């Protein structure tokens, strides 16, 4: 959802979505963005959203109520356009792709334990080349199939191995399944 990019602009805008997205609850995004100064109206907590950020974005110290990378990213992107330093406290760590990408683009984002500290941008973000690898949760089905079939051999290429996204691999390693990785590289998020 582009709310995380748009909310840091001093604009009024509307967001709509396809049928699937329009069924997803938006309250968990509406709550922190409203606390940051956005005026938001919705369809009973669903899309479409009308967001008025024309008065600017205020800093926030937000305690995440649910583990959600989408909520965290909404706050991260919005806080970049804020009037002061913001922080996000994660009860349970979520995937960290947004933080990695934003740091590589020049944003000042720090981590102190479970707290993420976001400094407002002082200049434009740098452009970077972004490579989007395959989703490990989609690969998990094929890995499980290979594990339960004796003498199987499965090779997956270009699959994301971010530590916050490979819980199933960690479980399989504890079960003594033979899983090897090769050609590992770090990308921009």
Language-model-derived ranges and their functions:
Residues 1-189:
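Structural preference for solvent-exposed beta-strand-turn elements
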């Amino acid at each position: 959802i582009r709310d995380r990019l748009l909310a840091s602009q001093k604009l009024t805008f509307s967001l709509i979505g396809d049928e699937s997205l329009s069924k997803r609850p938006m309250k968990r995004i509406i709550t922190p963005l409203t606390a940051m100064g956005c005026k938001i109206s919705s369809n009973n907590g669903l899309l479409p959203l009308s967001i008025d950020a024309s008065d600017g974005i205020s800093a926030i110290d937000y305690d995440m109520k649910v583990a959600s990378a989408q909520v965290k990213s909404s706050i991260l992107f919005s806080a970049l356009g804020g009037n002061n330093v913001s922080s996000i406290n994660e009860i349970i760590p979520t995937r960290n792709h947004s933080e990695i990408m934003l740091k590589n683009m020049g944003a000042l984002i720090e981590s102190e334990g479970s707290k993420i500290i976001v400094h407002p941008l002082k200049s434009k973000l740098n452009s970077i080349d972004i490579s989007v690898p395959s989703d490990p949760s989609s690969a998990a089905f094929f890995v499980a199939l290979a594990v339960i079939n004796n003498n199987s051999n499965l090779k997956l290429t270009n699959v994301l191995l971010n530590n916050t996204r490979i819980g199933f691999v960690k479980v399989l390693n504890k079960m003594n399944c033979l899983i090897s990785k090769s050609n590992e590289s770090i990308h921009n998020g």
